[in-house]
């Protein structure tokens, strides 16, 4: 969706945000209403759908894969997550064909950077490393179904939702012939008259309370904004993609990624201000997510989420 | 495991001639002229229609409007993860099939020198993806108010030991099972799309085609109800 607004409208918008009032009544540090639903796709290991302000709509699905790698080739353990953002043509006809690929790759790359130290950040992510040379690969795929600004923000919320929904099978690793290992799914016997392959596999979940998130902070006029609407995105001077992760040890926030997006000029001091705004916003978001993940009712698998 | 059990049921508990539940929602995409979310059981499809708008010079036709379709599947839609959501041979083929089918449904002469974009996204694929896309597209076009000869409906049918089974799931879409996807207008004898996969004995062809035609008529009944209900719900907005 391309937005065309006149110079006078832009002026109105810019002078508004400089006085901390946006066109939809929010202040500069406010997010739009967030809708977060988990467990929406039965065909995935974990899924989540996030809507921002009823118009930006992102769907995240995680597929696990048992990956073998060469431990000698990696100096230090590589983090097991890989991200892929796809802009569906449904969101806007400008994304048809290869139209959304460039922006999608840009966001995917930023997520890859923001999550590059996730083995240190997420407390139990190292459990995905099963044995020397084997690990669970976590493929996080995002599909942007509707677009109305702030796609990276919606994506990072969907990633956190999907990671918290993700169930990883417990496995038993036993040494095998020729220095290899055999990996078998763990099925704890609870009694009852069942065949071995009918016993459900034990699962474990990731601890996502410190999961990194990627926020966009935009400079409009002299003000810094989060969660921009499409009209506001027309007026952006410069935009930063800032990765923030909660530090569980000192109760503060770490910056995991800073990327300037879409050109423009920035002063050094502005970058400082913008990262501060990002970590402040992240604090609110972490609280809201934690509350939502606790209170969300468990849906039955395969319910219709877009109805 | 056999596809039809000895008691005459399929793996998901359906009878051979029974379709899965169809759930729909129209008009959920605010940016598009028309949109539809459709479920055939676990197959979930999202379709958006943009246009008609003035087409680019490369696609412009002087006497009618150009139909541009794009079929893509999310990378997590199938059993195995895919690397690319679109652009592979199968997606391109399905896009072209949809394009040709809807060129003969839409009254293209009403919009010379314009273009209509149809975008289908399979969010979760559990068999009969092409049929689900045709059904979703028909409803999205109806939602966009684009004049058509009628509502198109489609179904995928297979044949197991001379018995036809309809609305296949991905577990039933095996390499050996012959399957036909048929689309008709208003459940009548007007075929707009037919596609056969795998090898089928010629004696079985009429059996499968009859089953497919009957299923298309069944699906049409469902789609017509949805379209009418949506129109009723919109009546206060339209002012009558």
UniProtKB/Swiss-Prot annotation, chain B:
The keyword Isomerase does not apply. GO terms for molecular function: RNA binding. Keywords: Cytoplasm, Exosome, Nucleus, RNA-binding, rRNA processing. GO terms for cellular component: cytoplasmic exosome (RNase complex); nuclear exosome (RNase complex); nucleolus; nucleoplasm. InterPro entries: ExoRNase_PH_dom1, ExoRNase_PH_dom2, ExoRNase_PH_dom2_sf, PNPase/RNase_PH_dom_sf, Ribosomal_Su5_D2-typ_SF, RNase_PH, RNase_PH_CS. Non-catalytic component of the RNA exosome complex which has 3'->5' exoribonuclease activity and participates in a multitude of cellular RNA processing and degradation events. Belongs to the RNase PH family. This is Putative exosome complex component RRP41. It comes from Caenorhabditis briggsae.
